[in-house]
Amino acid sequence: RLSLVGSEMCIRDSLQKGDEIIISTLEHHSNIVPWQMICEITGARLVVTPINQKGEIVMGEFVKRLNSKTKLIAISHVSNTLGTINPIYEMVELARKYNCKILIDAAQSAPHFELDVQKIDCDFLVFSGHKTLAPTGIGVLYVKYDLFEEMIPFIGGGDMIKEAVSYTHLRAHETET
């Protein structure tokens, strides 16, 4: 699910050389490796915000890392190793000041907390299905509606296509011009 967001951002050229993605030292490798790979492809830079001795994100350091180059913050709601609950509401509010997107990895929180994506105001929220007793290999990717409408699918077919002919197609939400 994280790779889908990153891949789509590459396709849309919304990440370019010099842009920055912020993660924390609390992240599971599934929220590190996709961004490392995307940075290698795009020339964007991965910026890591530190934690203190209690395992909490140092908010002052997080704020220092935010700037006009920040395009995405990808942060865990709850740490998989320490159980630390990150201040996602505060982090989203700060992200909005810099007009960057925010992705919440809710793999550890989805089974234990009520998650209201409208209240959180995140752009993306992801979690693995097996954390909620679903089968292994499936998961959830929430995308804020306005971003979903802008996204360019990199896998197509089925109900997403309104009409297809030999050399072109019309997506279900598009109108003919």
Where are these regions (language model features)?
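Conserved PLP-anchoring active-site segment centered on the Schiff-base-forming lysine
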Residues: R12-I32
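Active-site phosphate-binding strand-loop segment of PLP-dependent enzymes
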Residues: R45, I51-P111
